[in-house]
Regions:
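Left-handed beta-helix
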Residues: 87-88, 92-101, 106-107, 111-113, ...
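Terminal amphipathic alpha-helical/low-complexity segments used for targeting or macromolecular assembly
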Residues: 1-76, 182-187
Length: 187
């Protein structure tokens, strides 16, 4: 999973995040009106400084941004650690979102309130692919989730999910399969 290592990476992540929110550029009033987007902006800057700090001043900036991100996250109900999400993250609403620090999520993930991405069995951490939509109150616990997957409201994902499907229920089952017939094993 790529992380932010250069200023170009930071710009690319911030641009992808803005695009995911449907914004063309960052404006000051988004700090107030788009609180999740503001949180993400701080998170991305915190990731950059944590990954690149080499001087004492850089470590101070990294610590300051980590604290700001933590306090804003607590106000919004987010517990999202650094270096988990790829570019293009979109947090739909404020509300409780908990993500394990060893989870890995690909590009263009849309996440709603009440979502938990955490450890399943001891030592099993989720890996989520690209272009994934996670609906409200869904849980992904130690499972691998493919690309272009929609996790419907209230689903509890504990087993691997293939690409191009929708899952729902407790435990999560495939409710819609968008894969070609050959990929499904049908003739």
């Amino acid at each position: 999973m790529p992380v932010i290592r250069t200023r170009e990476d930071l710009r690319a992540y911030l641009a992808a995040d803005l695009t995911a929110y449907g914004l063309r550029r960052w404006r000051l009033h988004h700090r107030i009106l788009k609180r999740p987007a503001h949180f993400q902006r701080l998170l991305r800057k915190s990731e950059y400084w944590a990954n690149t700090a080499r001087t004492p001043a850089g470590h101070v900036v990294a610590a300051y941004l980590k604290l700001r991100t933590k306090f804003l996250g607590e106000r919004l109900g987010f517990d999202i650690p650094r270096n988990v999400f790829g570019p293009g993250l979109s947090i739909a609403h404020t509300g409780l979102i908990v993500v394990h620090y060893k989870a890995r999520v690909g590009t263009n993930c849309r996440i709603h309130h009440g979502v938990t991405i955490g450890e399943g069995r001891p030592g099993h951490f989720p890996t989520i692919g690209d272009d994934v939509f996670i609906s409200p109150m869904a849980m992904v616990l130690g499972a691998d989730v493919g690309n272009r997957v929609a996790i419907r409201p209230g689903a509890v994902v504990t087993k691997s999910v293939p690409d191009d499907v929708d899952v729902a229920g407790y435990p999560a089952r495939i409710v819609k399969d968008r894969r070609p017939r050959a990929a499904r094993g049908e003739d």
